[in-house]
């Protein structure tokens, strides 16, 4: 009989950027069918179709579990400062029961500074707040995520 034998690997646990005591939340991004998540901006008609749980006027929203928001004294539609080791941005709070406690979720495809007045300065560019998480064994990117904090503005 053939047996597959894999070598024993002493892999380290993957660590997100940022001290968890200073940045107690985990920030991840989400994609939307209505927004281009790449370098190109979304067409204006798609921006009009974006839900108001993602973008209100020019303010980008983040999803956070009501329990987590409550511990921080934050409520629906309140403005907060989202800070990571890589940067900070003003965001609006959207309470979402579907978001895991301790997590903050931000939409991809917003925060462009070009592409005309209709797309520029709408929401937050998540790329300025987070970076790749490298697998210590292979050096390859494993996930998007970073430690973060939210504070009332």
Which stretches of residues belong to each language-model region?
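Long, contiguous, secondary-structure-rich segments that constitute the structural scaffold
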Residues: 40-63, 67-153
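Long, low-complexity segments enriched in small/aliphatic residues
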Residues: 1-53
């Amino acid at each position: 009989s053939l047996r597959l034998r894999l070598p024993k690997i002493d892999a380290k646990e993957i660590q997100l950027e940022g001290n968890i005591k200073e940045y107690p939340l985990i920030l991840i991004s989400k994609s939307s069918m209505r927004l281009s998540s790449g370098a190109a901006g979304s067409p204006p008609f798609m921006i009009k179709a974006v839900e108001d749980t993602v973008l209100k006027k020019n303010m980008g929203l983040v999803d956070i579990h009501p329990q987590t928001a409550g511990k921080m004294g934050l409520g629906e539609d309140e403005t907060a400062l989202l800070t990571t080791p890589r940067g900070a941005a003003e965001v609006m709070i959207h309470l979402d029961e579907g978001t895991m406690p301790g997590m903050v979720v931000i939409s991809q495809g917003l925060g462009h500074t070009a592409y005309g007045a209709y797309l520029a300065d709408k929401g937050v560019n998540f790329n300025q707040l987070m970076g790749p998480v490298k697998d210590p064994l292979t050096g390859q990117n494993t996930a998007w995520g970073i430690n973060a904090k939210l504070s009332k503005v």
